[in-house]
Amino acid sequence: MSISVEALTKVYGQQTAVDGISFTAGPGVLGFLGPNGAGKSTTMKMLTCFIPQTKGTASVCGFDIGTHPLDVKRNIGYLPESNPLYTDMYVKEALGFVAGIHQLHEPAKRISEVIEQTGLGPEQHKKIGQLSKGYRQRVGLAQAILHNPQVLVLDEPTSGLDPNQLIGIRQLISDLGKTKTIVLSTHIMQEVEAVCDRVIIINKGKIAVNDTLPALRSANSNKTLEQIFIRLTNS
């Protein structure tokens, strides 16, 4: 499995943000759902080595997040909800900067591939600050996949996009999920139903359910994902 998590825990003072969760993930798109404050973003930050865990273990592509953080980062692409970008940079300039960080062998070739893959061609010569939110999200995603990682962690990648932009980003995520392991955090149930192969619902720092969408519906009298989510988290 590309991701393996065992009893992962994060404690802030007296508050347990993530409480001993365990799961595995392989190629495909894993929907990571939960209400605000459930521990989703904290889990993602631990998996991407932005913050250390308090207890438990996790590995990405066989590398432990505690003992081999640089190897984890080489094998993972992360698009945080805030999508930090250098708005004074041109699109190609920003991608070139990221390519330099990753020391890519043929940066120009890879940048061209990613620009085409993410649909940034028409905007590649603009400054990032001139782009719409949809294209900024594409730049963030392009940066995340530039070094061709096996694992992608995407935190609310379609937040604030219009319907046309949503379709484009969802299709891109779906295409990437054919060969990569993607952890997708979102509050949009239709998005999960459109692109995810499996769903984890986390509530109060614990995993409430971990299953495929068909199995989840079958076990809940074919209720909608939204109805299932409300039942599991409204307590």
Question: Where do the protein language model's features map onto the residues?
Answer:
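Conserved ABC transporter NBD signature motif
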Residues: G56-T67, D71-V72
